[in-house]
Amino acid sequence: GVCDMADLA
C-alpha cells in the first residue's frame, strides 16, 4: 500500500 514488503510481494 505505502511501500511495504507485503505491498510489493
Curated annotation (Swiss-Prot):
Signal peptide segment: none
UniProt entry keywords in alphabetical sequence: Antimicrobial, Fungicide
UniProt GO BP: defense response to fungus; defense response to Gram-positive bacterium; killing of cells of another organism
Top-rank taxon: Eukaryota
Transmembrane helix as UniProt keyword: no
Function according to Swiss-Prot or TrEMBL: Antifungal activity. Inhibits mycelial growth of F.cinera, F.oxysporum, M.arachidicola and P.piricola. Lacks protease, ribonuclease, deoxyribonuclease and hemagglutinating activity.
Complexes and interactors: Homodimer.
Protein's UniProt name: Alveolarin
